[in-house]
A protein has these predicted regions:
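Structural preference for beta-strand elements that scaffold enzyme active sites
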Residues: 9-11, 55-57, 82-84, 106-108, ...
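Residues at the C-terminal ends
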Residues: 50, 78, 101-102, 148, ...
């Protein structure tokens, strides 16, 4: 299945817990009781590497709540994988970056509004998330310049009713963000369908937001994803080591990858490379 494919990313949601309460979240994993332990995690990374994967992205929940995330990143890099992490930034300290930053190719930060009141209303932090985001971006840029790190910065933003009128142009340029993923809020049954109607926007509102940032789009910084782009176009792994896939606005799950192997497990959930490529997933670090 992977033959001829290039630069495939696997998103391992290794930690189910989170210290934020984003209302639109579609990765609660409320039915999962445990994460993989460190030995199981190393075995999972071995399986990923054996199947011609280009990059592993560590996500959550909040991945920095997982005590083993740094060692998993380090091990992945040792196996020759490109590495990235998506975090809310609240727990990524200079000490952590000093220890593990050389093993990271990309750090993505989730931030949905440039207004702290709006962030708080939607559950993104506790009133200072804009400052947390900008401080971390600045820290990464400085450590790249002064400490020999080579980490690309990325921002993830979910566009919904509360923020679709905002203008991010200055913020993105000022903070040297290399890649900005802009998602239209996605409805997932059993995850956020109970709040979706109060947060959703229509296509016109979403594409007005994209058009407002056309300069960033022209520069290749902005990468938009509407709901169609997010269907069957990600390779995602649960905290307990199963593939899962967004299909028709609900998740389907495979058997354990460690039990049946990567190739057998991914056949159970599917993956559409053409949609992955269309949404800009195939890119180099």
């Amino acid at each position: 299945m992977m033959k001829g494919m290039k630069r495939i990313t696997v998103n391992w949601h290794l930690e189910k817990d989170c210290n934020y309460k984003c209302k639109f979240c579609y990765a609660h994993f409320s039915h999962i009781n445990t994460n993989l332990n460190i030995d199981q995690g190393f075995s999972l990374i071995d399986e990923i590497k054996k199947n011609d994967i280009y990059k592993i992205n560590f996500a959550g929940g909040e991945p920095l709540l997982n005590k083993n995330v740094g060692e998993f990143i380090k091990y992945s890099k040792q196996q020759g994988l490109k590495t990235s992490i998506i975090t809310n930034g609240s727990r990524m300290t200079k000490k952590w970056l000093t220890k593990y930053g050389r093993n990271l190719d990309q750090i993505g930060i989730s931030c949905d509004s440039l207004d702290n009141i709006t962030n708080t209303k939607i559950g993104r932090g506790f009133g200072n998330h804009v400052e947390i985001t900008e401080r971390l971006l600045s820290r990464i840029n400085l450590m790249n310049e002064n400490d020999g790190l080579n980490i690309q910065t990325k921002l993830n933003t979910v566009v919904l009713r509360n923020n679709h009128m905002e203008d991010w142009n200055d913020f993105i340029i000022r903070n040297n963000v290399r890649r900005w993923k802009v998602f239209k809020i996605l409805k997932i049954v059993g995850e956020n369908d109970h709040v979706y109607d109060g947060l959703s926007i229509n296509d016109k509102q979403f594409y007005n937001f994209i058009d407002r940032h056309r300069l960033l789009n022209d520069k290749g910084i902005l990468v938009k994803e509407d709901n169609e782009d997010m269907s069957n176009s990600y390779i995602m792994i649960t905290p307990d080591g199963k593939f899962y896939q967004n299909s028709n606005n609900q998740y389907i799950y495979s058997e354990s990858i460690l039990d049946v192997g990567f190739k057998n497990a991914i056949k159970q959930t599917g993956f559409d490379y053409e949609t992955y490529e269309k949404r800009g997933g195939d890119y180099s670090l």
